[in-house]
Amino acid sequence: MAIIISYEKNGKTIYVQKGILCDISLLDKPRIWVDFNGPWTDLYFLSQVDIIRDSNGNEIELTENMEISIFDLDENNNSDNLLADGIVILNDTGEYPSVKWLVKIIPNNKYGKFYWVSDTKK
């Protein structure tokens, strides 16, 4: 379940979906956490709100067609996390109305659709 936090900035309430912080040594670069176990084959739930935090805690404001780098934790708690790249899209599927943003996976030219952190170090 996503955790939403809020704070005041310039007189406006800003809502941020907390991501999963991850030791940068376990990733190749800052990435946004996504659960790769979803109901579709190339779309995954991304966020309920417009701002999400990456693995380093940086706030990322989501926009349509924005390219992002994502990860999911290894299901066996190994340090070799699963990686992917994608494009942010609005959820216009008519399903799961509480989810505003989805990510569409774009295969990486070098590694394919999904790849491991260890692949980036070869």
Residue positions per predicted region:
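Short, charged beta-turn/beta-strand-edge "cap" motif at the junction between a beta-strand
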Residues: 72-78
